[in-house]
């Protein structure tokens, strides 16, 4: 998605966009490490991307709200700026109030650990993190809150 200079890999993205044809295409959070985000947004628009998923180049979207709002004001009619990262029921209305029309979240909750079979490499780091599962109640609450705020 981006090269070792932390800029968009335009030839690769042109190829991907060509393969995607008329499908809706989102550029994911690799955007958050690009050096010049506004130039990158212009390039993604020119390439025909529909959406960029971003935390506003911060650890979580609430900390990036100023960037998200600014980009949405400048580019939001040409590409959907979709905040993602740390979004939940407690803060989803902030994004709506900032003029952002969509959000991305896992809507998950921590679940009980499961027994890992002996054939699985238990040293994989993600196996040492709490297990999460999407929670339809959380998702329903966020949708209702965001939709009707």
Model-derived regions: residue spans:
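A cross-domain feature marking catalytic cores of carbohydrate-active enzymes
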Residues: 1, 27-31, 56, 83-85, ...
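Glycine/small-residue-rich loop that forms an oxyanion/phosphate-binding "nest" at active or ligand-binding sites
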Residues: 1-14, 19
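Glycine-rich phosphate-binding active-site loops on the catalytic face of alpha/beta enzymes
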Residues: 1-5, 49-62, 100-120, 130
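Catalytic cores of alpha/beta
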Residues: 12, 32-47, 69-83, 87-105
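Histidine/lysine/aspartate-rich catalytic loop segments that bind and position anionic ligands
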Residues: 12, 16, 22-62
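Short helix-capping segments at alpha-helix termini
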Residues: 20-23, 74-78, 148-149
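Short, basic, helix/turn surface patches
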Residues: 25-29, 78-87, 128-141
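C-terminal helical cap(s) of enzyme catalytic domains, especially alpha/beta-barrels
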Residues: 65-74, 94-98, 112-149
């Amino acid at each position: 998605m981006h090269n070792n200079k932390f800029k968009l890999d335009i030839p690769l993205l042109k190829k991907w966009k060509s393969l995607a044809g008329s499908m809706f295409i989102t550029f994911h959070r690799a955007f958050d490490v690009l050096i010049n985000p506004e130039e990158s947004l212009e390039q993604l628009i020119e390439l025909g991307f529909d959406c960029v998923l971003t935390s506003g180049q911060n650890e979580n979207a609430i900390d990036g709200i100023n960037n998200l709002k600014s980009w949405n004001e400048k580019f939001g009619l040409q590409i959907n700026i979709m905040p993602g990262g740390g979004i939940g029921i407690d803060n989803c209305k902030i994004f709506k109030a900032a003029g952002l029309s969509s959000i991305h979240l896992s809507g998950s909750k921590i679940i009980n650990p499961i027994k890992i079979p002996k054939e699985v490499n238990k040293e994989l780091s993600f196996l040492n993190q709490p297990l999460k599962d999407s929670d339809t109640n959380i998702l329903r609450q966020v949708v209702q809150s965001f939709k009707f705020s």
